Amino acid sequence: MINSKPILFSAIQPSGNLTIGNYIGTMRYWSSFQDDYECLYCIADLHSLTTLNKNFSLKKSILDTLALYLACGVNPKKSIIFIQSHVYQHSQLNWILSCFSSFGELSRMTQFKNKRKKEKNDIKNINIGLLNYPVLMSSDILLYQTNLVPVGQDQKQHLELTRNIANRFNFLYGDIFTLPNPLISKNGSKIMSLLDPTKKMSKSDTNKNNVIFLLENISSVFFKIKNAVTDSETPPKIYYDVKRKLGISNLLEILSAITNKEIFILEKEFDGIMYSEFKNIVFDNISKFLHKLQKSYLIYRKDESYLKNIAKEGAIKARLKSEKILKRVFSAVEID
């Protein structure tokens, strides 16, 4: 029987400890997607090579990430879970799609622009992998005839590039690639820094007090929440307003996601309470969430042979699926 479910693709880099922002923005939805979509969940280790150093163990981080996927409810019997580098078709398609991409559009991508700004426009030492990063991402998506990609508002640019590249290829060679669409959540797609809620929470942040990591010691989270930025409104009021109350809004986003309560309900619950009491409630709920997640994670992480077997089986399934589209691409450009 032909599977008529829409195809959904999502990936996370194993380049460091995943954050509560990763969970809220993407991973919390993964288990619920499995019944409605044909899901492919990728561990994007090739993407990680743009930022790694010799003191970082990529192999360990890949297994850590895989165990977290399972702890978040991804079922290998329902979804394809695989490691990007284990499916060589990603790299093959990446080169072909690079020939349908321009330096101009890649240099306008947010990550490259931010790096360029940081280097004060001196681009000679910027990693070429960072420039080509969005093309590899496009390859990841297009390789599986993906219909939907869960993305945050800040990631729509990458998906637009993917569609542009696919359209260029299709214009020349016919309808080879499916054009993917974004799947954007209403709330929580962009969790902000705790101390500077004008910027996104990032696992690469040099100030770790800005970030809540999924695997960190829960006691340290207490101090991070305690010191999280709020505001000076008098008397203190707890409501969602991303223009005037960035810090409070961010904490409400986090709490809403891990309790599955709508923000307007939380606003009513916290009417009239002090910020310190609100923070204590936020911490209590984060603590319960992390304890449950970490307990499940440790069970999976202890069995490396099980994790490696999941990765092996997932790679076999992913290669079978990706080879179909790659053969069509090779035939179109006459390198078959």
Curated annotation (Swiss-Prot):
Catalysed conversion reaction = tRNA(Trp) + L-tryptophan + ATP = L-tryptophyl-tRNA(Trp) + AMP + diphosphate + H(+)
Q: Which PROSITE patterns match?
A: AA_TRNA_LIGASE_I (PS00178)
What's an example GO cellular component term for this entry? cytosol
The entry marks the following residues as binding L-tryptophan, namely: D140
Its main subcellular localisation, reduced to a broad class, is cytoplasm
Q: Which cysteines are joined by disulfide bonds?
A: none
Q: Which residues bind ATP?
A: Q13, P14, S15, G21, N22, G152, Q153, D154, I191, K200, M201, S202, K203, S204
The listed location of motif 'HIGH' region is 14-22
Origin, by domain of life?
Bacteria
**GO terms of biological process kind:** tryptophanyl-tRNA aminoacylation
Q: Motif 'KMSKS' region: where? A: 200-204
Q: Which key words are in the record?
A: Aminoacyl-tRNA synthetase, ATP-binding, Cytoplasm, Ligase, Nucleotide-binding, Protein biosynthesis
EC number of the protein: 6.1.1.2
Which compartments does it reside in?
Cytoplasm
Q: Which SUPFAM superfamilies match?
A: Nucleotidylyl transferase
GO molecular function terms attached to this record: ATP binding; tryptophan-tRNA ligase activity
Q: Hey, which family's this protein in?
A: Belongs to the class-I aminoacyl-tRNA synthetase family.
Q: How does it assemble?
A: Homodimer.
What the protein does comes down to: Catalyzes the attachment of tryptophan to tRNA(Trp).
Protein name per the record: Tryptophan--tRNA ligase
**Source organism:** Buchnera aphidicola subsp. Schizaphis graminum (strain Sg)
Q: What is the lineage of its organism?
A: Bacteria, Pseudomonadati, Pseudomonadota, Gammaproteobacteria, Enterobacterales
Q: Which gene encodes it?
A: trpS
